[in-house]
Amino acid sequence: PTDPEDAALLHFTSGTTGSPKGALHVHGAVGAHHITGKLALDFHPADIFWCTADPGWVTGTSYGIISPLTHGLTMVVDQADYDPARWYSILQDERVTVWYTAPTAIRMLMKAGPELPRGHDLSSLRFVGSVGEPLNPEGVAWGAEVLGLPIHDNWWQTETGGIMIANYAAMDIRPGSMGKPLPGIEAAVVRHEDDAVSVVDPAGEEGGLALRPGWPSMFRGYLGEEGRYRKCFKGGWYLTGDLARVDEDGYFWFVGRADDVIKSAGHLIGPFEVESAIMEHPAVAEVGVIGKPDPVAGEIVKAFVALKPGHEPSEE
């Protein structure tokens, strides 16, 4: 018989340096896939579900295949290239009720304009979720305005194997927030030095996002890299490598990857916060922010901006 700790899945995830890491998951992870589908994506047996992630990625496996199967859902599978008109047609024609996609796809749909969705009947949709990167507040507002539904962002990693923090269906969404930890998940914002880990206090301070180990879908190792795996755990916490803050009401907010933070004139600047501010401009369709080396400040903020149709760049 299969044991819950028997190896089941090997998901590869890119590292900031070196070759991709193979994260090992066990058969017992299916328990987390099942319950998080219910709690974070509001699965019901009669749902028609479409996850736009490719099955070669962890989302496409965990939530494009495994989780919906455990709930007996009808699933939409589409392998064609992205096309906004066809996507809206799929939502309409297949009567999709739960849609799980990525912030990049949402921004591409935003860029395509509001006329396309107005020409389709999207009344079957009752829940829209996003994952893979932070969802800017503008994306949440677009969902409410164009789809008639707010978009529920959530957070997890290849290493966590399943959704850890989410904007549940029944909770008030704070645009830009990844939500709150799921039941049974203990998350905190921490600082660590050597093996000492301390929880950040007060609320609102930035630090490393950490989870207490022990949930069923937690990865059990990196293929052939035991030392690298051990370094992820310190002081009774799994250190995710992401930076975050938590507000006084327990909502978590993504700041950036620890190795992506821009260090400028003694200040730590999260690219996502700058991107969110730029995205507020009505002419902006897409933006990416990096740190550019500077002899005085160490790094300065550099933004790459794509404009919406009908807008031209200028020196201003």
Regions flagged by a language model, labelled:
Residues 46, 70, 96-101, 110-174, ...:
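Gly/Ser/Thr-rich phosphate-binding loop
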Residues 132, 156, 179, 242, ...:
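Active-site glycine-centered loops adjacent to acidic/histidine catalytic or metal-binding residues
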Residues 148, 196, 212, 216-241, ...:
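Conserved ANL (AMP-binding/adenylate-forming) active-site segment centered on the GW(Y/F)…HTG consensus within
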Residues 8-32:
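Conserved AMP-binding A3 loop
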Residues 188-212, 248-249, 312-315:
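Conserved beta-loop-beta connector loops within the AMP-binding
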